[in-house]
A protein has these predicted regions:
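N-terminal lobe of the biotin/lipoate ligase/transferase fold
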Residues: 1-132, 137
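Conserved, well-ordered active-site substructure
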Residues: 146
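Conserved phosphate/anionic-ligand binding catalytic regions in large, soluble enzymes, centered on
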Residues: 149-151
Length: 151
């Protein structure tokens, strides 16, 4: 069974990453079980693996920029924004990463439908979900994953 955890207060990105890495290591050793973490971060920009190599800025408007080992480009995290970290063993579940991302998007689509908010996908390369507002698509669900050792 997957344990759901809510980390209260605004968390430093680096501290959460350290905790997550320890948990994932223990999962790979079959010491820890799968968990899903819900939290808010202190203001931070993260620069994923698709960020251009020329991008060498340490902060934007006095907000730190941290290079991270997940897919995607630059993403802002901050107070009031819910961040969800599913620590799931895909190898054990016999799921590939594309099916997993599709499942995450499907869950979000169904959850938002309950509040009469219709979300849609764009092309396969551009993962995440969009909502329509004032005749314009606004991306409101961002998915940036790191996949290592089947987790």
């Amino acid at each position: 069974m997957i344990e759901i955890k809510q980390l209260k207060g605004q968390k430093k990105y680096q501290e959460v990453t350290q905790l997550m890495n320890k948990h994932i290591q223990k999962m790979s050793e079959n010491i820890k079980e799968e968990e899903i973490w819900f939290l808010e971060h202190e203001n931070v920009f993260t620069a994923g693996s698709s960020t251009p190599k020329e991008f060498r800025i340490d902060e934007i408007n006095k907000i730190p920029v941290i290079k991270v080992n997940r897919g995607g480009k630059i993403t802002f995290h901050g107070p009031g924004q819910l961040v969800i970290y599913p620590l799931i063993n895909l190898k054990k579940r016999k799921k590939n990463i594309i099916d997993y991302i599709n499942s995450l998007e499907d869950i979000c689509i169904k959850a938002f439908e309950r509040s009469n908010i219709k979300l849609h996908r764009k092309k396969e390369k551009n993962r995440g979900l969009w909502a329509e507002k004032n005749n314009a698509s606004k991306k409101i669900i961002f998915i940036g994953l790191r996949y290592s050792k089947g987790i």
